[in-house]
């Protein structure tokens, strides 16, 4: 279960800006057609994936758009009819989301603060599942492209990747 209702009341809801999404395009494996965006939020990532020609399965525990299906990634059964997962998880639950993404057995990409590399638990997940890191060149302001004074959340961020052709690597966007 997600901790409290922080995401529901927007305390842990930070959309990814376009410039931070664009570098992942070349890391989507060939043959992928249907991508599950398990934390769809307002659709920042999903809109880009749709623009690139992918079918997006939009789910979120707290839907914010009409096209989003209510689904708790950590508690509900997995969406089976997808080729890959791409998402921006609640940062307070990055370890749980990493573990669950690894359990799916599917390729995935998810963006989070570089602190994902810390702790023995996450270290073991990286090693066991041969995960790679796509390092972004600048800190990310998670405002979804909507610059506001209210929400300026800057992190040095990375994309965590499970990919059949990229294993145990640090890549640079």
Placement of each model-derived feature along the sequence:
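Class I S-adenosyl-L-methionine-dependent methyltransferase catalytic core
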Residues: 1-173
